[in-house]
């Protein structure tokens, strides 16, 4: 590969770092590699290893999406040991430009580039493509972002919408709030609508009912719900989907996202059929007088595994980022 024709893009989470190359003027990632973060002392080592694997000595510029709040030039990863200074890394590699963006900002920027084959329609539509899009994703946490259309593209909205207060709507949810408040103090929607949150919800339901909670990991709960081997797991996952629908609907109303709601992240594709049959749809549209507006808003599950890389590639040439 000829180095001067490529830029480096990456999507770095708590566990893995995904890297790819993109040609100048393109957003299609090539030579994708996934490196375990624990195997590398720092970002520099991981980048060097990646470039060696793909046979490129250097690239002109780079954009990395990171699972971390961004303030200034110092980056401290939320769920792994990497720490780096943006300008110092740029100088080490001799890049002409180095952008670092939030991982969910990248997810949002990638959504317009996801093919129809990797979008599963959940409900609603046809929507209005000229209006904002909401991007939400339960995974390690609950990411929330938005896209506002401009003349030649999109402006991403960097938010911490997963940290808004959890608002219970019935007696069971009041009990869930009481139990989680005793554990965490303040209870955000992310305390429920993410992988660890599903486990929190399962344990709370078990305590409310006075029954055992033998499942100790979110993937065990989803597996038991899908194969109907644990009744409590099934009910809890239904409740999880319902609350996700309600929360997505609230965010859609706030943003005015008639351009669509896009559900990303690693969780939902793992139990997609269950999700499509869950109370999500009704919870999303059940907004009283606003129901017709919600029914007009299309909702999709994004199954593209490298949406963040697409977004990082988009960010390279997006002057709004």
From Swiss-Prot:
Name the InterPro entries on file: ATPase_NBD, Bacterial_glucokinase, Glucokinase
Protein's UniProt keywords contain Oxidoreductase: no
Task: Identify the residues that bind ATP.
Answer: 10-15
The GO biological-process annotations, alphabetized, read as: glycolytic process
Gene Ontology, cellular component aspect: cytosol
Pfam families the record matches: Glucokinase
- Tell where it localizes: Cytoplasm
- In the Enzyme Commission scheme, what number(s) does this protein have? 2.7.1.2
GO MF terms, alphabetically ordered: ATP binding; D-glucose binding; glucokinase activity
Q: What class of enzyme is it?
A: transferase
UniProt key word Plastid: no
Which reaction equations make up its catalytic activity?
Answer: D-glucose + ATP = D-glucose 6-phosphate + ADP + H(+)
The protein's superkingdom reads Bacteria
Keywords (A to Z) from UniProt: ATP-binding, Cytoplasm, Glycolysis, Kinase, Nucleotide-binding, Transferase
Family statement: Belongs to the bacterial glucokinase family.
NCBIfam families in the record: glk
Matching PANTHER family, A to Z? GLUCOKINASE
Q: What is this protein called?
A: Glucokinase
């Amino acid at each position: 590969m000829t180095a001067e024709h490529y830029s480096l893009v990456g999507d770095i989470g708590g566990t893995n770092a995904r890297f790819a190359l993109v040609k100048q003027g393109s957003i299609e990632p090539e030579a994708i590699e996934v490196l375990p973060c624990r195997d590398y002392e720092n970002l520099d080592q991981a980048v060097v290893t990646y470039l060696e694997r793909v046979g490129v000595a250097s690239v002109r510029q780079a954009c990395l999406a990171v699972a971390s709040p961004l303030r200034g030039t110092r980056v401290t990863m939320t769920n792994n040991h990497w720490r780096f200074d943006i300008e110092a890394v740029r100088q080490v590699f001799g890049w002409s430009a180095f952008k670092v963006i939030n991982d969910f900002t990248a997810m949002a920027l990638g959504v317009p580039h996801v093919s129809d084959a990797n979008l599963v329609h959940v409900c609603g539509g046809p929507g209005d493509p000229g209006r904002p899009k909401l991007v939400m994703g339960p995974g390690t946490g609950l990411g929330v972002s938005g896209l506002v259309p401009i003349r030649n593209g999109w402006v991403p909205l960097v938010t911490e919408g997963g940290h808004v207060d959890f608002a219970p709507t019935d007696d069971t949810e009041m009990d869930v709030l009481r139990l989680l408040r005793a554990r965490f103090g303040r209870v955000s929607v992310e305390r429920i609508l993410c992988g660890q949150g599903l486990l929190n919800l399962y344990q709370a339901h078990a305590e409310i009912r006075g029954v055992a909670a033998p499942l100790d990991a979110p993937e065990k709960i989803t597996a038991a719900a899908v194969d109907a081997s644990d009744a409590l797991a099934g009910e809890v996952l239904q409740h999880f989907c319902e609350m996700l629908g309600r929360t997505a609907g609230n965010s859609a109303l706030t943003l005015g996202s008639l351009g669509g709601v896009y559900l990303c992240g690693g969780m939902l594709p793992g139990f997609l059929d269950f999700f499509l049959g869950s109370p999500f749809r009704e919870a999303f549209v059940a907004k009283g007088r606003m129901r017709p507006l919600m029914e007009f808003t299309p909702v999709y599950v994004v199954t593209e595994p490298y949406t963040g890389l697409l977004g990082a590639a988009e960010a390279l040439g997006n002057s709004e980022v």
